[in-house]
Amino acid sequence: MSYTLLRMTPADAPLTVEWMVRQYGFDRTEVEMWVCDLHFNWSLSVKAVDDKGNVIGLLNMSDYRIEEETAQIQKDNPDLLARLNSQRYTAVFSFIVREDYRGTHLNYDMMMEIMPELKAHYDFIFIPVLHRLKTHGYWQRWGAREFYRDSDCVYYQLKM
């Protein structure tokens, strides 16, 4: 299984929308708004392409703020939010790997593609994970620690 890792550009927005709608069952219009409004960091986002040119994975990074993801944290724990916002961070907006590549080294390779930049420019990565997803253990194995939860997600912090 050979593949190439490429940095994404705004031209990849429709690809991101398509993958998120297909993978998560989200409403297309809502995902299109997110992609437009949530400060995607395209230069840190990665797509994996197999040797036939098929996209097999997307890692979308975004510079949106924690309170844009969960406004409830401002009410529940404003001191925590202030401490987190005093640091430099970026968010994992979505991380999707084609099913036949799950359990391979692809996820790791995609993260390692951007790790030097993450370590150089950020104090932590903000990772919101919907309760229904199975990726909680994945991020915990990377060392991410839960800092908040609401009715939709568990919010993790992966220190750099």
Locate predicted features.
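A short beta-loop-alpha structural element at the N-terminal edge
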Residues: 2-16
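Active-site rim helix/loop that mediates acceptor-substrate recognition in acyltransferases
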Residues: 25-55, 60, 65-66
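Short hydrophobic/aromatic beta-strand element in the GNAT-like acyltransferase core
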Residues: 43-47, 58, 89, 94, ...
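Conserved acyl-donor/pantetheine-binding loop and adjacent beta-alpha core of acyl/acetyltransferases
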Residues: 60-94
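Conserved GNAT acetyl-CoA-binding A-motif
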Residues: 89-90, 118-131
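Conserved acetyl-CoA-binding loop-helix of GNAT-fold acetyltransferases
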Residues: 94-97, 103-116
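Conserved beta-strand-loop-alpha-helix junction that forms the acyl-donor binding cleft
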Residues: 99-102, 126-137
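C-terminal "cap" of GNAT-fold acetyltransferases
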Residues: 131-132, 142-160
